[in-house]
Amino acid sequence: MAVCAASRRLTLSNVLQGVYRTELVRQHAENSAINFYAQRLTRPALTAANSNPWLSKRSFSTSQAFKDGGNIVIYDVIATKAPDGDVLTELTSTKAEDSPKTPKSPKSSSEKPKSSKTKTKAAKKSGTKYLASELVNPEKKVKRPHWQTQKEALEKKFTEGWHPRKKLPPDSLDTIRHLHATKPDVWTTPVLADQFKISPEAIRRILKSKWQPTEEERERREERWAERYKKIYSHMEELGLRRRKGEWTAKVSDARRLGLEGKSIRQNFRRKPQARPEGTEINISRPDREASPKESTSLE
């Protein structure tokens, strides 16, 4: 046979216990419980849970409330205003017989700030210890190679880099050295830098260097310059910026006078005077003066 589980709960002891508790609820509700909870609802008492928001969020009850189970039932009945039938069903259930488990008592409100203070003190101590360890044992700086420091110094000195916009020819370098050697007080480094439009550091390095080209290097340089000038002059002649080298310029050249260059095909560039026999007279007209005597005009 199947037995109903709800019928097992309806024992004599459970029914008597429920009736006794309902009468206690009525007596307390009529006298003191109504006033007490009404005051509590209208003006809540200042407790640790109200003062501390952390504790107010947590739902817990005091040990006295757990000892007296009737107080909990009174508060629930007054707040909800449930009928007596509902109360009887709740009381006759097995949940009422089971003793409520006492939860762990939470930490008091006075312990929390102490713990926070201790945490802050510990954090400060750890921070001071860390700073002290940094001061006592600073990290060793990695030593950079010599070439890197030299490169940074050269970059600061030469802002334009290794390929400057203006490059001086060898003749200008020799001129700079000669001027500084003859009159170092007049041709100082800033003056030379301003004159040749380069940086003072470049002037210092030019004066400091003692390199001199060899004879072979000089000959190669002269040949290279001659070819360069020929190209430049021929291009200028094609554009009409320079006159072509003619015969009249060849006659006046130093090479012609020294006999290093052959005579041109047209030797008689100007007309020669006609040959006159000896004893002929040359008449020179002078409009402002009188005629010269005949003896002075005769050619011997």
UniProtKB/Swiss-Prot annotation:
Coiled coil: none
Family: Belongs to the RRG9 family.
Boundaries of the annotated transit peptide in chain numbering: 1-67
Keyword 4Fe-4S: no
Disordered as annotated region, ranges: 91-132, 259-300
The entry's keywords: Mitochondrion, Transit peptide
Protein name: Required for respiratory growth protein 9, mitochondrial
Its job: Required for respiratory activity and maintenance and expression of the mitochondrial genome.
Basic residues bias spans: 115-127
Species this chain originates from: Talaromyces marneffei (strain ATCC 18224 / CBS 334.59 / QM 7333) (Penicillium marneffei)
Domain of life the protein comes from: Eukaryota
Record InterPro entries: NGRN/Rrg9
Localization of this protein: Mitochondrion
Primary localisation category: mitochondrion
GO terms for cellular component: mitochondrion; nucleus
